[in-house]
Amino acid sequence: MEAVLTRAGLWFGAMVLAVLAAAYAHDGGFAAQMMIVAVVALAGLWVSVARADVGAIASGILRMPADPSKYDDDPVRWGVLATVFWSVVGMLVGVLIACQLAWPQLNVEPYLNFGRLRPLHTSGVVFAFGGNTLIASSYYVVQRTCRARLAFPGLARFVFWGYQLFIVLAASGYLLGITESREYAEPEWYVDLWLTVVWVAYLAVFVGTLARRAEPHIYVANWFYLSFILTIALLHIVNNLAVPVSFLGSKSYSAFSGVQDALTQWWYGHNAVAFFLTVPFLAMMYYFVPKQAERPIYSYRLSILHFWSLIFLYIWAGPHHLLYTALPDWAQTLGMVFSIMLWMPSWGGMINGLMTLNGAWDKVRTDPIIRMMVMALAFYGMATFEGPMLSIKSVNSLSHYTDWTIGHVHAGALGWNGMISFAAVYFLVPRLWKRERLYSLRWVNWHFWMATVGIVFYAAAMWVAGITQGLMWREYGADGYLVNSFADTVAALHPMYILRAFGGTLYLAGAVLMVANVWLTILGRQRAEKPMHQAVYNASADRPIVAEPEYLAEAAE
């Protein structure tokens, strides 16, 4: 009971402080966000008092639960549910802003205009959908590969709920116009501080689990996860160094200025793509692809070479975002050179993942989850070829500031991050909820095709739009003046913007189908359907044996 009172007291104190901060706030946005914190603290107080499990709390939140033989999968289950929820929210906002670009009348001032919804979309899919995927999958993978329960179970739960609070504060801030205007780092100083606390707790849980492992070897997926956690911490702290105007206000000013500010921002921005959207998703690939294919990783040595090559090269490539700017030319060239070198280790990882399917290629036809993983690896290979190509100065002179970059980013995000995340969710749900199988594998197949066709429409439309923009912007007449005004280029892109909205809608529809599939699986239902076609397979020839048509068999008789 004493522990319950202590926790209730902490929640009550947090609520009082939040209410006082809201009362004395220097601006309305800060007051609104402090009231959100107060509501969260009130909910925590209510849970502590009304639903307290005195026995569990008395045992100590940092001690092992009674049965150490089972893995601690509660935070993983919550993370999977959060992943599914935020995927739909983030993609729904993405479809809305795609429609706003095609039909500007859909902008609603001030809260639902493109300027406020665009960072909500990017943070929603990167940090809410992607971040929850990574936290949940890392908790699952580190326990299985270390044969140990999560260290600090209470802290693991704090990480989950603390991260959801970060998402809510960041998202509500964007709608209120509270932003640092730094790509992928829009939240203001107090939200950044909260995320730092949550991230340190995440690091403690992950490293603590590694330290208590029963398996002597640390599997390579955990190397990728740990580098993700450490590097994102470094990037987040340095890039978000700022001086608040007031400790009771939302506004702050960066510690950097001028070209140093730009370089610091894109050192962070590029490496957010590298160490948030690439490295930890490769950790997922190195665990889930072999598990689903029931094959060992093709080359463990190649995975180690892949890891160290990426770690050394990726951190230097940020200046390629600042080609043809005030950044010194030597720094631009350095970023270009390291970006080109990244092509080989990136493809090494793709090849390692694809070659893991040696002897199991028949499953690509019969297992839509494997098919999603293969498509994810294909898009990873394509995006990591296109990125170095776009960093070459002569190519970048055409693509810079155009929608080609948008197409490149979304081919990677939708194809690589989205597909591998969906596959991981489909892998995890039956195992976490102890179900025989998913509600419907055929729905997974439908999801795969809707997502794939949606990506093709989206990326192709943006590639065409980007090249159109680049060529129209640089077209000069005989008199030496530009032929096209900016408005002319925008009008020319209208058909491509409609195609982008259509592709995004298809991709969103697939995610909604996933939500239904996951929910019905959790409820324990199974759709009455024939299993996916299993062709008779000739292993030596690595191809299916084509059945003889019935009329030929009858003629032979």
PLM region spans:
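Hydrophobic cores of alpha-helical transmembrane segments in multi-pass integral membrane proteins
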Residues: 3-57, 77-178, 190-210, 222-247, ...
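Acidic, Ser/Thr-rich low-complexity segments on the non-lumenal side of membrane proteins
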Residues: 547-557
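Active-site-proximal inter-transmembrane loops
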Residues: 255-264, 399, 404-406
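Membrane-interfacial, low-structure loops and terminal tails that flank and connect transmembrane helices
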Residues: 54-76, 360-363, 435-438, 528-541, ...
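Conserved, charged catalytic cores of large soluble enzymes
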Residues: 62-63, 235-256, 261
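Membrane-proximal first intracellular loop
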Residues: 67-74, 116, 185, 214-220, ...
